[in-house]
């Protein structure tokens, strides 16, 4: 059985809403255990991540980056980095913001760099951008 952690911060419920959809999708994969974990809880005990095979990160985009609470979680993993405890695990991320641009890509890049610092393997999105499927550019979803 593979273990997957969805680590997220949600101040107003929007990121949590997306996290629950990610949870449902991941649980549809046979032989996969998926846990939804708040970033603020992991900041106190980041060692809880070590049994997982993959980590999906979720944060709102605030002023072009992850939320302060999510950054606190990221910073708390310093010891795991020194031990290379997350090396070789899978990583992915998602974000939400209230504006069409809002620099969501910067937030996803922060998660990507965090994963690379830990030696994780980033899992990208296998879908073409929506504008290639006929969706108007102003309605298309930003993807990394």
What are these regions (language model features)?
Residues 8-12:
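Aromatic-flanked redox-active Cys/Sec active sites in thiol-based oxidoreductases
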Residues 2-4, 14-17, 21-39, 47-59, ...:
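FMN-binding flavodoxin-like domain, especially the glycine-rich phosphate-binding loop
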């Amino acid at each position: 059985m593979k273990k997957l952690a969805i680590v997220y911060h949600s101040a107003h419920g929007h990121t949590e809403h997306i996290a629950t959809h990610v949870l449902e999708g991941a649980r549809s994969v046979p032989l996969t255990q998926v846990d939804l974990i708040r970033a603020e809880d992991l900041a106190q005990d980041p060692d809880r991540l070590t049994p997982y095979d993959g980590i999906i990160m979720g944060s709102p985009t605030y002023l072009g980056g992850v939320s302060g609470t999510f950054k606190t979680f990221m910073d708390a993993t310093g010891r795991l980095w020194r031990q290379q405890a997350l090396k070789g695990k899978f990583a992915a991320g998602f974000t939400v913001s209230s504006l069409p641009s809002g620099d969501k890509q910067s937030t996803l890049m922060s998660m990507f760099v965090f994963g690379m610092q830990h030696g994780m393997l980033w899992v990208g999105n296998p879908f073409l951008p929506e504008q290639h499927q006929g969706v108007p550019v102003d309605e298309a979803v930003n993807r990394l």
